[in-house]
UniProtKB/Swiss-Prot annotation:
Signal peptide: none annotated. Belongs to the universal ribosomal protein uL13 family. Transmembrane segments: none annotated. This is Large ribosomal subunit protein uL13. The gene is rplM. GO terms for biological process: negative regulation of translation; translation. CDD domains: Ribosomal_L13. It comes from the Bacteria. Coiled coil: none annotated. It comes from Limosilactobacillus fermentum (strain NBRC 3956 / LMG 18251) (Lactobacillus fermentum). NCBIfam families: rplM_bact (TIGR01066).
Length: 147
């Protein structure tokens, strides 16, 4: 009798990938990176185990916003104080804090559970070309073929 393969947390082989976000649409980038963080690209994917890889996103400041999203899409946050609702457009958000915008978009596509938070910790986003994870010897991943 055959049984479905279920990965164990200690048996997962993780890789490090570098993704260049230059000129790629934000949503397409986020969905592809979220899939890699979950491990959906592996044959050993198990829904209840974190089987994903580490991802480093570089050039987050040069991600592309299509259509009128730069002026029409509004991000809201609240300080939990009366009258503390803050808002800013996607264009302002991208100009002031591109790392946080890309990270927030990718984490929004992960499961909203404790396992999803663990998956989100494997994401590293940088606005420019350089990153601090050279010691991990990350592979360059061209996601234009995966989109």
């Amino acid at each position: 009798m055959r049984t479905t393969y279920m990965a164990k947390p200690g048996q997962v082989d993780r890789k490090w990938y570098v993704v260049d976000a230059k000129g790629i649409s934000l949503g397409r980038l986020a969905s592809t990176v979220a899939s890699i963080l979950r491990g959906k690209n592996k044959p050993t994917f198990t829904p209840h185990v974190d089987t994903g890889d580490y991802v480093i996103v570089i050039n987050a400041a040069e991600v592309k916003l299509t259509g009128k999203k730069a002026t029409g899409k509004i991000y809201y946050r609240h300080s939990n104080h009366p009258g503390g609702l803050k808002q800013r457009t996607a264009g302002d958000f991208l100009a002031k804090d591109p790392e946080k915008m890309v990270e927030q978009t990718i984490k929004g596509m992960l499961p909203h559970t404790s396992l999803g938070r663990k998956m989100g910790m494997k994401l590293h986003v940088y606005a420019g070309e350089s990153h601090n994870q050279a010691a991990q010897k990350p592979e360059v991943l061209d996601i234009t073929n995966l989109i």
